[in-house]
Amino acid sequence: MFRSAARFAGKEIRFGTEARQSMQKGVQRAVSAVATTLGPKGRNVIIEQSYGAPKITKDGVTVAKAIEFKDPFENMGAQLVRQVCNKTNDLAGDGTTTSAVLVASVFSESLRCIATGTNPIDMKRGMDRAVGVILQSVAEQSRKVTSTENIVQVATISANGDEELGRLIGQAMEKVGKDGVITTQDGKTMTTELEVVEGMSIDRGYISPYFVTDAKAQKAELEDAFVLVSAKKVSSIHTILPALNHVVRTGRPLLIIADDVESEALTTMIFNKLQGKLKIACVKAPGFGDNKTAMMQDIAIFAGARLVGEEGSGLELDAENFDPAILGTVKKATITKDDTVLLNGGGESSMVKERVELLRGLIDGETSDYNREKLQERLAKLSGGVAVIKVGGGSEVEVNEKKDRITDALCSTRAAVQEGIVPGGGVALLRASKALDSLLGDSSLTADQRTGVQIIRNAVRLPAHTIVLNAGKEGAVVVEKVLENNDVTVGYDAQRDRYVNMFEAGIIDPARVVRVAITDAVSVASLMMTAEAAIVDLPKEETPAAGGMGGMGGMGGMGDMY
């Protein structure tokens, strides 16, 4: 028989119910703090910082990231809440608080059921079937984004109700297109402004995270940078040493876009970057085969560089005969783990226009749908421009907080464009819960599977319930009143305390946000409820400092060494 707790070699292990209840306590405490931010009348949370004034926020994922408990088992639960919030934020840009509320509800109810003898595996099967029905219902409720007004509404909600930021994002999408590149940078005034500049995007990010210059945003930013574009691998540091020496002498950064960079050269570049001797970043070339070479030619023309290593060009990386003319320039390069944005390339505008016209001609004459699509992608990247939102504010803290909100709003707005919008305010999940009534009556379900369905049915009603509670009203009463109305677009406007058509009132969520929130929450809760053991590190025991050592007073003279 397993014991309920055991200690082995600096670790503590808890088993079964005790392990799950310890984690559940941490989950509940963490979600209690996160849930207070949900909805238009959600409350602020004040977070102590390691330096400076406390941070005041209404962003669920920021609250989740700040929570850490002294008890390691409770902390494990809190970290799993943080994990689900982070994942939802990364995939959808919004819905983090909804995810937290859902994971706490599913986990808590499942533990109560397991304690009364419910089989967790069968219960999970029931949950999975319920989630499938929920996702189908959300898809059926979804509407396509048809206007800039819809985009502004989604962006405003995701930016915590900031209408100015929502309007700017709507304008940016209108100018560069729904698939266009929108980026942010620090402004030089108190106001936030929009500017469209010449730019190009590449669907590849940095080769190594060691190139990152902004640890918080996990991106590398190079200002007024040289650009080296190579169709071949950079296999040895010696082949690019003259280029590195050249950029070091000028004091400017270097962006290398190459077929690949092998470990020896990469290690040397990273070492020098970390030592502060070199400002550099490396990106793998986008595309495959002939399309890769063509895209590298596009990049070279945009930056005013010469494509080295191209077959038949006779232009190679040569340590003996380096010509600075092979390097192009960009005013700014922003590189994340997934993509790269180049602004204001040094290429001649006449050559860029000529390249654009060439691509248009190729598109017109192309018969293959696949090839035409690739050509259209290249054309969009070369000619679409980049919308830059210059974020203003009274302090660096204010600017950074605004940039975080814009990043989230951009992510959720793109999600809305791709997968459509659904009624907001928790209504989409609330309506989806009614679709589970027929599943509960399915005779093929076992009793334990039916329990799993019921747990999901209760959980998906909780986000709307929490929004109402945060607005100071009775959650259960409002939820039932919404469900009694047969019009699936009707919900509760917590800001104005009235029942409205959610689409007409502009209270909408991207369908992807709702989909990701329920999927991630149930996935993490299912893993926790089926856990049979939890292992944490024991706190290290402090070794008491040695007191005065009798008879050793003569060693006091060693103090002269300091």
From Swiss-Prot:
GO terms for biological process: protein refolding. Pfam families: Cpn60_TCP1. It is found in: Mitochondrion matrix. GO terms for cellular component: mitochondrial matrix. Induction: By heat shock. There are multiple isoforms that, with increasing temperature, shift in relative abundance from the more basic to the more acidic. Changing A521P: In strain: PBOL. Gene3D superfamilies: GroEL (3.50.7.10), GroEL-like equatorial domain (1.10.560.10), TCP-1-like chaperonin intermediate domain (3.30.260.10). Keywords: ATP-binding, Chaperone, Mitochondrion, Nucleotide-binding, Stress response, Transit peptide. It comes from the Eukaryota. Changing S142N: In strain: PBOL. Residues 1-8 form a transit peptide. GO terms for molecular function: ATP binding; ATP-dependent protein folding chaperone. Implicated in mitochondrial protein import and macromolecular assembly. May facilitate the correct folding of imported proteins. May also prevent misfolding and promote the refolding and proper assembly of unfolded polypeptides generated under stress conditions in the mitochondrial matrix. Belongs to the chaperonin (HSP60) family. Exists in at least five isoforms that are not related by a simple post-translational modification and may represent the products of different genes. This is Chaperonin HSP60, mitochondrial. It comes from Trypanosoma cruzi.
